[in-house]
Structures are given as structure tokens and as C-alpha cells.
Amino acid sequence: MKKGIHPNYSEVTVTCSCGNVIKTHSTVGRDLNLDVCGECHPFYTGKQRDVASGGRVDRFNKRFSVPGAKK
């Protein structure tokens, strides 16, 4: 490997907003702050909530539905 062309690879501390601290190595050169990590992300914790906001079809059906009509 050539000398002087590679970035410095140092240990950094990654801190999540939930308080989880991860020590890793990176070329960033400074400590990082995360909003979400594997300890608090809803997908990994199993605390997901189903977002059923509806789409364009649901909005159309709601707007133009006839009250009392059969479905």
C-alpha cells in the first residue's frame, strides 16, 4: 500500500438518542450521533405499528360513496 494516500482509520463512538453507545472504527474521524439504532428501531424491537393511512382509492371511495349502498 502506498503511504499517505489512505484516510486515517480511527476508533469512533456512535451514540444513539436512546442512550445506546457503540464503539467502532471509521474514517469519519469524529464521534457520531444517531437518531435511531438497532436497539430502539421499531422494526428490530417488534413494536411496529401498522400505518393504514389509505391511498388514493380509499380517498376516492370515501368521497363518492353513497350512504346506505351495498358493498
Curated annotation (Swiss-Prot):
Cofactor(s) the record lists: Zn(2+)
Gene3D superfamilies reported for this sequence: Ribosomal protein L31
Transmembrane annotation, as ranges: none
GO function term, MF aspect, one: rRNA binding
Purpose: Binds the 23S rRNA.
Keywords, in A-Z order: Metal-binding, Ribonucleoprotein, Ribosomal protein, RNA-binding, rRNA-binding, Zinc
Annotated family: Belongs to the bacterial ribosomal protein bL31 family. Type A subfamily.
Disulfide-bonded cysteines: none
Cofactor remark: Binds 1 zinc ion per subunit.
Cross-referenced SUPFAM superfamilies: L28p-like
CC terms in the record's Gene Ontology section: ribonucleoprotein complex; ribosome
Recorded superkingdom: Bacteria
PROSITE patterns: RIBOSOMAL_L31
The protein's name in its UniProt record: Large ribosomal subunit protein bL31
Binding site for Zn(2+): C16, C18, C37, C40
Oligomeric and partner information: Part of the 50S ribosomal subunit.
Coiled coil (UniProt feature): none
Gene Ontology biological-process annotations: translation
